[in-house]
């Protein structure tokens, strides 16, 4: 990323130090804002402090041909957050972005896997190897605990109470929550931990990381690596659909709801701050019910 202007440097410090935003979130905000600032300076001859409602709308208009509505909405959300910060810092009397309307987004439902497809993926890792044991434990926690991939990568050895079957995760905004997991997840984790030391063979004992999940060099596993391994297992299963780590989380929530769990409990398990975010899963199960009805009822 190019060097940041002083205002964006201050905003980055605010995101990191005060809001506790993840590195991924901070990076996305800054990418959006650097692009917006470039537009203001080069096209409008304005600065971030002199940006106007019309300039923001004009910027979004330049994105309309080659950016999806969701991408434009994210750019606007970054701009709104930035100007809200400037107002709170008394650098501006009001936000020029406040009345800019977000692009209309098509209603999309979470991508959910049938139970049998989830189980097929879980059975793919070769549990005769330490990396296979690691991947099996990762997949079990993604589905058995509904963890975000960033939460899973951030797990340390002390974050799991194996006897109590509890995982302590650091969610969005540095919000900590406790997540119960099933016995199979714990068994998979214990099998991996019994051989985890093999991944530390090239590392001095005093340099051993606290990370739960390690790569073959002994470092903390990254979200990109996990997504790549999942792609491999999906191909081995001969599934035709694309499966992301987040699809395992969606499947966790939808299968819980289908099994009778109440929406408030699922909200807590997922770490959603808003119930409306969790309520998307009720629409998924309703559509599934409609499909069952249409295929099974003699009058359908």
Swiss-Prot record:
Key words, A-Z: Cell cycle, Cell division, Chromosome partition, Cytoplasm, DNA integration, DNA recombination, DNA-binding
Residue span(s) of domain Core-binding (CB): 2-87
Annotated localization: Cytoplasm
GO BP: cell division; chromosome segregation; DNA transposition
Single GO MF annotation: DNA binding
InterPro entries: CB (IPR044068), DNA_brk_join_enz (IPR011010), Integrase-like_cat_sf (IPR013762), Integrase_catalytic (IPR002104), Integrase_recombinase_N (IPR010998), Integrase_SAM-like_N (IPR004107), Tyrosine_recombinase_XerC/XerD (IPR023009), Tyrosine_recombinase_XerCD (IPR050090)
Ranges where the Tyr recombinase domain occurs: 108-294
Any single Gene Ontology cellular-component annotation: cytoplasm
Keyword Cell division annotated: yes
Principal place of residence: cytoplasm
Active site: 148, 172, 246, 249, 272, 281
Source superkingdom: Bacteria
UniProt cross-references to Pfam families, sorted A to Z: Phage_int_SAM_1 (PF02899), Phage_integrase (PF00589)
Similarity remark: Belongs to the 'phage' integrase family. XerC subfamily.
UniProt cross-references to NCBIfam families, sorted A to Z: PRK00283.1
Primary role: Site-specific tyrosine recombinase, which acts by catalyzing the cutting and rejoining of the recombining DNA molecules. The XerC-XerD complex is essential to convert dimers of the bacterial chromosome into monomers to permit their segregation at cell division. It also contributes to the segregational stability of plasmids.
Quaternary structure annotation from Swiss-Prot or TrEMBL: Forms a cyclic heterotetrameric complex composed of two molecules of XerC and two molecules of XerD.
Protein's name in the database: Tyrosine recombinase XerC
């Amino acid at each position: 990323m190019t060097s940041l202007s002083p205002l964006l440097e201050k905003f980055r410090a605010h995101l990191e130090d005060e809001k506790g935003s993840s590195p991924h979130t901070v990076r996305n905000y800054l990418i959006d804002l650097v692009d917006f600032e470039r537009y203001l300076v080069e096209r409008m001859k304005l600065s971030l402090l002199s940006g106007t409602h019309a300039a923001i709308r004009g910027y979004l208009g330049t994105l309309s041909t080659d950016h999806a509505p969701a991408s434009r909405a994210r750019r606007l959300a970054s701009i709104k957050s930035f100007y809200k910060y400037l107002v709170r810092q008394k650098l501006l009397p009001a936000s020029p972005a406040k009345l800019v309307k977000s692009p209309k987004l098509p209603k999309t439902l979470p991508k959910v896997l049938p139970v049998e497809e989830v189980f097929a993926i879980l059975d793919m890792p070769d549990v005769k190897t330490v990396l296979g044991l690691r991947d099996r434990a990762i997949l079990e926690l993604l589905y058995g605990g509904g963890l975000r991939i960033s939460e899973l990568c951030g797990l340390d050895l002390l974050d799991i109470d194996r006897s109590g079957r509890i995982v302590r995760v650091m969610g969005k905004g540095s919000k900590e929550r406790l997540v119960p997991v099933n016995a199979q997840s714990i068994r998979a984790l214990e099998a991996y931990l019994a051989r985890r030391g093999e991944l530390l063979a090239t590392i001095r004992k005093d340099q051993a990381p606290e990370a739960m999940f390690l790569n073959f060099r002994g470092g903390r596993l990254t979200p990109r690596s996990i997504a790549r391994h999942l792609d491999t297992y999906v191909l081995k299963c001969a599934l035709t659909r694309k499966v992301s780590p987040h699809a395992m989380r969606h499947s966790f929530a939808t299968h819980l709801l289908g099994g009778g769990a109440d929406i408030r409990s699922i909200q807590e398990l997922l770490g959603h701050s808003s119930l409306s975010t969790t309520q998307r899963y009720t629409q998924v199960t309703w559509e599934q019910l409609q499909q069952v009805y249409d295929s099974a009822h003699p009058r359908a």
